[in-house]
């Protein structure tokens, strides 16, 4: 199936991480079905699924109560292009659950969420430059796809190819955990925001030092810079309220997903 896909899909996959080159496979697994903790490929090989669709299948594949909820919802329609009661109920639950959240904007992807959060920070602070960290992945928007630790790196491509210098010159990328470099940059530049994965997943699910995150919080307040926690992966997992609840550190903005 991989060879059949390659003439029609660039690289044979629709996101680089699915190529499986980082685990030294010649071809990705083409999934056919899944149930509970197991997944079957097109050749009927069964696997214990540790990928879990890269996060969303935290309850396993096709639990009965989820299937029932989806079936009940689809009977009322699949897409309206209008506000719904469910959006309001979800927003209220998120405000109640996640420490930093006061209001919620729903998006269709993690990339759109992080891109919107950075745009909001720039608008609020009236500054352009942002700080991110090596190995932290925040989606594939141009400004954030710099030293991202994404699956692009396992395919042999530089993650900034195709991005004009004028776009990423306002993205400052620093070593993760180096608070001294952060402070130096905050002192010398007007920084709109710092965006960080509080638990970076794309460089090995590294648990951050609480002291580093606490220092980020203190220094951003000091210099009028917004702190964004990208919790697309860590949210609801390490604690119901995400890594910000787990570490006891409240950012200005956060993104959630999966």
What are these regions (language model features)?
Residues 1-33, 174:
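Active-site-adjacent loop/helix segments that line or gate small-molecule/cofactor pockets in enzymes
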Residues 46-128:
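Glycine-rich loop-to-alpha-helix module at the N-terminal edge of alpha/beta enzyme cores
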Residues 123-145:
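Conserved PLP-anchoring active-site segment centered on the Schiff-base-forming lysine
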Residues 137-199, 207:
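PLP-dependent aminotransferase-class I/II
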Residues 206-239:
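Catalytic PLP-binding core of fold-type I/II PLP enzymes
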Residues 244-258:
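Conserved active-site segment immediately N-terminal to the catalytic lysine
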């Amino acid at each position: 199936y991989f060879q059949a896909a390659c003439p029609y899909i660039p690289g044979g996959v629709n996101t680089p991480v699915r190529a499986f080159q980082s685990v030294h496979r010649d071809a990705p697994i083409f999934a056919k079905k899944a149930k509970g903790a197991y997944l079957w490929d097109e050749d009927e090989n069964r696997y214990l699924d540790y990928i879990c669709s890269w996060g969303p299948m935290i309850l396993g594949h096709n639990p009965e109560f989820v299937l029932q909820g989806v079936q009940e919802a689809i009977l009322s329609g699949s897409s309206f292009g209008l506000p719904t009661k469910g959006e309001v109920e979800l927003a209220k639950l998120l405000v109640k659950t996640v420490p930093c959240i006061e209001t919620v904007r729903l998006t269709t992807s993690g990339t759109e969420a992080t891109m919107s959060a950075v745009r909001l920070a720039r608008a609020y602070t009236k500054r352009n430059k942002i700080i991110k960290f090596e190995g932290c992945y925040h989606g594939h928007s141009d400004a954030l796809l710099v030293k991202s630790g994404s699956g692009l790196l396992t395919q042999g491509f530089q993650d900034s190819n195709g991005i004009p210098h004028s776009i990423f010159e306002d993205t400052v990328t620093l070593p993760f955990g180096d608070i001294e470099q952060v402070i130096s940059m905050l002192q010398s530049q007007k920084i709109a925001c710092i965006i960080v994965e509080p638990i970076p997943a794309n460089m090995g699910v590294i648990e951050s030092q609480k002291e580093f995150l606490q220092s980020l919080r203190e220094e951003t307040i000091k210099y009028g810079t917004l702190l964004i926690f990208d919790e697309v992966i860590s949210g609801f997992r390490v604690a119901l309220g995400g890594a910000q609840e787990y570490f006891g550190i409240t950012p200005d903005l956060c993104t959630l997903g999966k």
